[in-house]
């Protein structure tokens, strides 16, 4: 079936919540843009921990997480990944099959424990009592909300431990740091600046805190956040987004930045590979860009085993042995959140052949919020039982007779093949033309007076390229010149206002602000003059600094064009620019008279002495003062008598013709 008619799923046996999913809204043209990503790591470095505190943090199981610096988030990339996340399976549905963030990923990337007691306990409706007990002080009413406390209150009151602090005070300040750490990273909420105090009792004994499966809890929290954000009505996402982004960097060749340095492959945890400044054009990439990339992703864009050459020398033996839990079909628990971990749907991430996975059992997600005031252990008995059986539910090794072609045929029937509706080539072309018009308008309105010569010429080059792109477009409205460009590049000629169009057409009574359209001539390089037996197109360029019009002869044979010859000029004469391919009848008569005078050996009616710099300078100064020159016929005649010249002006000097009010001069 045509993917445009039905992008999937063709059968709703797996993705039964398609109508609620953001991909349905995107297909219908309802763009929500990039998600607001809530992760609060920017001020973690302001905590000044003493050696005793660092020791307690490591005993609690957060020694590696503490070392991870703030990593700039790519919100559009994260948003595009969310569009591929399905909460029915807790996996990404890509073109190559399903993938997910596993327990193995979180252990290797963050260095958090994935085996141990589930992170669950009491929830609280107020902060005062629990903060007083574990921190030694309680927040004011403006620093707390229900069972949550502001991160800023924790930092302001506990970020620096006095040198002479008692051991009890050191423990209290360390608990405050741990609460801030988890609330800023693995358990960040959409509130943006608060963390639940229900984690504090788990830090009462630091050695006991190290026996919890914090990595499994962090993954449950992220799964829930991804599922919530995939609903089309949502606009925010929380959880450990550094984990999600770095997982994508390792597994997908989409949005991956280039490192400014050679990575340290064995630095553990592996998320440290992406710390520091990075290169790459990600700044200008939006959700649509990443969505298109994911829609056409190929198998070669996927790295199924990104850690196989990384040994993680600092990893403990306990953690190394627990990596097998990455293949465990189990339930992940984080207080009020329980999420299924289904690695059997992503066997290729463990170097196994992918067969058709078992049906996903539908389950009702339990969530009582953080203000329930109850012990959740009594509310999640079945989920806790599954976690207890985690080592008995390891996905087996390869079985005989697995055909991945059968899997892909099945998968394409149950998945959402693409998220973005394909755009026709004509629509893409029109969008490009519209963008070029915008670029041209911006360039023409750019304030170039304060720029140096190089940058000014660069702006001129941009204008020329944009005009060249728009030249042959039907219905393209010519872009008006700005007053700034008129002052720099155009001059009035007598009582005549001139507009160049095509190959230099002259028309009277044209406003100097009138549009400059593209050339009607097929030549791409401007007027043609004969040199010997070859006709060289002259490339027309405006100088934005002195108002001259420069013509550069194209010298490459491949760029030359054939044309009808113009009258043969004497070889002893230099070639001046020919301006105006289409003349009014009166103008044509004047031009023919000038040509005839020249061929008869007479001095041209109008000529200039290139050595009379003082006279030119005076005229230029007058022009600059007026903005446009008004030169009467009598003044022209006086100049003709004064200027006895030999022909042979250079191309750059021909620009003075414009400033003196001349029409067309042929030497």
Curated annotation (Swiss-Prot):
Protein's recorded name: Protein MAIN-LIKE 2
Keyword vocabulary terms for this entry: Acetylation, Aminotransferase, Nucleus, Transferase
Statement: the UniProt record of this protein carries the keyword Transferase: yes
InterPro entries (UniProt xref): AminoTfrase-like_pln_mobile, MAIN-like
Major location category of this protein: nucleus
Basic residues compositional bias, start-end: 492-508
Function per UniProt: Maybe required to maintain cell division activity in meristematic cells.
Protein source organism: Arabidopsis thaliana (Mouse-ear cress)
Any GO molecular function: transaminase activity
Region ranges (Disordered): 492-523, 594-667
Residue spans of biased composition, Acidic residues class: 512-523
Modified residues (N-acetylmethionine): 1
Pfam families: PMD
Biased composition (Basic and acidic residues): 608-618, 656-667
Tissue/organ expression: Expressed in root tips, the shoot apical meristem (SAM), leaves, mature flowers and embryos.
GO terms, biological process: meristem maintenance
Cellular-component GO terms for this entry: nucleus
Highest taxon listed in the record's lineage: Eukaryota
Disulfide bond positions: none
Subcellular location: Nucleus
């Amino acid at each position: 079936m045509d993917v445009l008619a039905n992008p999937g799923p063709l059968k709703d046996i797996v993705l039964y919540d398609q109508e609620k999913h953001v991909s349905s809204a995107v297909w219908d043209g309802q763009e929500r843009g990039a998600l607001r990503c809530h992760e609060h790591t920017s001020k973690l470095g302001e905590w000044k921990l003493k050696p005793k505190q660092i020791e307690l943090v490591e005993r609690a199981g957060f020694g590696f997480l503490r070392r991870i610096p703030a990593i700039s988030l790519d919100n559009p990339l994260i948003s595009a990944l969310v569009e591929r996340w399905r909460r029915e399976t807790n996996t990404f549905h890509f073109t190559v099959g399903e993938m997910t963030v596993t327990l193995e990923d979180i252990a290797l990337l963050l260095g958090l424990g994935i085996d141990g007691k589930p992170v669950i306990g009491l929830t609280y409706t107020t902060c005062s009592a629990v903060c007083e007990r574990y921190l030694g002080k309680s927040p004011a009413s403006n620093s707390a909300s229900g069972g949550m406390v502001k991160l800023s209150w924790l930092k302001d009151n506990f970020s620096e431990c006095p040198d002479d602090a008692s051991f009890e005070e050191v423990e209290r300040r360390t608990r405050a740091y741990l609460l801030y750490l988890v609330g800023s990273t693995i358990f960040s909420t959409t509130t943006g600046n608060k963390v639940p105090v229900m984690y504090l009792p788990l830090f009462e004994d630091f050695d006991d805190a190290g026996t919890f499966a914090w990595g499994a809890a962090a993954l449950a929290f992220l799964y829930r956040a991804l599922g919530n954000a995939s609903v089309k009505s949502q606009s925010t996402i929380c959880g450990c987004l550094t984990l999600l982004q770095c997982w994508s960097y390792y597994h997908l060749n989409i949005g991956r930045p280039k490192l400014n340095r050679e990575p340290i492959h064995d630095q553990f945890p592996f998320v440290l590979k992406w710390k520091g400044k990075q290169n790459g054009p990600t700044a200008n990439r939006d959700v649509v860009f990443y969505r298109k990339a994911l829609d056409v992703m190929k198998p070669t864009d996927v790295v199924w085993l990104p850690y196989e050459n990384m040994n993680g020398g600092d990893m403990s033996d306990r953690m190394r042995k627990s990596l097998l839990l990455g293949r465990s079909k189990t339930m992940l628990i984080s207080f009020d959140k329980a999420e299924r971990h289904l690695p059997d749907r992503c066997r290729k991430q463990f170097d196994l052949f992918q067969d058709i996975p078992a049906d996903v059992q539908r389950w009702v997600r339990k969530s009582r919020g953080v203000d329930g005031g109850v012990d959740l252990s009594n509310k999640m008995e079945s989920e806790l039982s599954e976690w207890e059986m985690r080592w008995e539910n390891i996905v087996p090794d390869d079985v005989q007779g697995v055909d991945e072609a059968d899997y892909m045929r099945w998968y394409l029937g149950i998945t959402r093949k693409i998220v973005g509706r394909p755009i026709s080539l004509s629509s893409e072309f029109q969008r490009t033309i519209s963008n070029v018009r915008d670029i041209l308008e911006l360039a023409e309105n750019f304030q170039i007076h304060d720029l140096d010569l190089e940058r000014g010429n660069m702006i001129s080059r941009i204008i020329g390229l944009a005009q060249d792109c728009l030249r042959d477009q039907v219905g393209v409205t010519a872009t008006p010149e700005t007053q700034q460009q008129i002052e720099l590049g155009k001059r009035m000629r007598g009582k005549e206002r001139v507009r160049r169009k095509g190959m230099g057409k002259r028309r009277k009574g044209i406003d100097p602000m009138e549009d400059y359209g593209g050339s009607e001539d097929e030549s791409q390089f401007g007027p043609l003059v004969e040199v010997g037996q070859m006709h060289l197109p002259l490339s027309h360029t405006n100088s934005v600094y002195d108002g001259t019009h420069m013509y550069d002869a194209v010298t490459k044979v491949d760029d030359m064009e054939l044309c009808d010859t113009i009258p043969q000029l004497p070889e002893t004469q230099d070639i001046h620019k020919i301006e105006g391919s289409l003349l009014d009848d009166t103008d044509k008569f004047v031009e023919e008279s000038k040509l005839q005078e020249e061929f008869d050996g007479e001095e041209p009616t109008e000529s200039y002495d290139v050595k009379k710099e003082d006279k030119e300078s005076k005229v230029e100064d007058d022009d600059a003062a007026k903005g446009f020159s008004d030169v009467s016929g009598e003044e022209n005649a006086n100049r003709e008598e004064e200027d006895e010249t030999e022909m042979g002006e250079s191309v750059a000097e021909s620009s003075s013709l414009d400033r003196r009010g001349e029409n067309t001069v042929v030497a």
